[in-house]
Amino acid sequence: MSKLGIDIGNYAVKTSTDDIFESKVTEVKNFGSDSDSIKIGNKTYYLGEGDEEINIVKYEKENFLPLLLGAICRNTDDEIVDLGLGLPVKQFAGLRKNLIEKLQGKEYHVEFTRGNETTKRDITIRSIQTFPEGVTGYLYYAKDIVDQIAGRDVVLVDIGGKTTDIALVQGNKATDPYSINVGTINIYDAIKKSLEMDERFLGKVEIKREKIQDYINKGFYLNGEKQDIKKNIDASISLFKEIYNELKLNYPVSTAAVVVMGGGAKLLGEAFKKNIPGIIVMSDVDKHVFANAKGYKK
């Protein structure tokens, strides 16, 4: 029996074992692909490929079950699993029972393929625990920033794949939840659009969303020369303003500790730091991206 925390976001699936893959599935294998696949019933799904599927209620997405079972198969050989899963703070009270009833006690007969090896699996989800997204990840790493928090209430800003969830955290309790339809995907798309419309690159290069983070981290090269794309990256600032205006109007950002986390923390971190003195940006992608999943397991 294994216990796993699985964070199924709109952009990526993360697990408590430090595994991550894109929240995409397709029934048509891409040429030359070496992606893992999972067969459920008479359908085979290739993980991490295809198009994103966006739904405010994540567990109602058609790709939810292939992503969940795929994450289980990728991370444990055990047949019986206990799972920790998350819901947005605003949905937690109303939907947690539905999520538990959807999965708890269910059995799934699947075939999982990695490379040239295919295994038949009979997976039983013995139990489901649900947790509020963002808050759980923050509490998991709170010990690392306890001196910066200094006993204050916390305004938590969790920038996910397609939404930003905000809540006021007092002790271990979250109140005043609010969700904005701005996330990492929107940020990447804004930068992508700016690059595509830039006359320097027009018609010369194909810009792919999945490469945007590499361009930010490693630079954008054309014909062997590194290009200055600061203004293109700054095209996402208007999205920051949507989040900032909500914080400024409805949360005690001048007296509380403001903590930004999630996949978009690194992307918008500098903009936050310029506008909110003393803000804590949890932007260590290799570490903090797994915060929710690790908190769900704990």
Q: Which residues fall in each region the model found?
A:
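Long, well-ordered mid-to-C-terminal structural blocks that present hydrophobic/aromatic surfaces
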Residues: L168, N172, A190-K192
